[in-house]
Amino acid sequence: GILKTYYIDTYSANKMGMEQTIGSPSILTMRNGDKDLDGLIASIDKGILVTGFNGGNCNSTTGDFSYGVEGFLIERGKLSQPISEMNATGNMLSLWSNLAEVGNDPRLSSSWRIPSLLFNGVDFSGL
């Protein structure tokens, strides 16, 4: 994909000296990809399926983040063992630059209509 614009609300625009692009998003959506979650998992040789977050933080100025995560280890396209008490760390700009694939399974029970996402190069610790 190509980033065409940023979501910048009034507060952030004033703080950064930029022009406001939105008021506040009420429903965030993303164009669906071709694979469901099982298809995304099958395409991964070694990785981690994050199913939940256990606290953490993100610096809104730098984009640096650290979140506790839980989920499953993926090996050779299959879920292997459950994981917990791990951390995912990085930078939001780098994370979104490394978005590799988008699923076709958005959750409809949330104001964020975002499908499963596959990222490359995420740093995890604690396994």
Where are these regions (language model features)?
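Dual-mode signal for accessory low-complexity, basic/Gly-rich regions
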Residues: 2-127
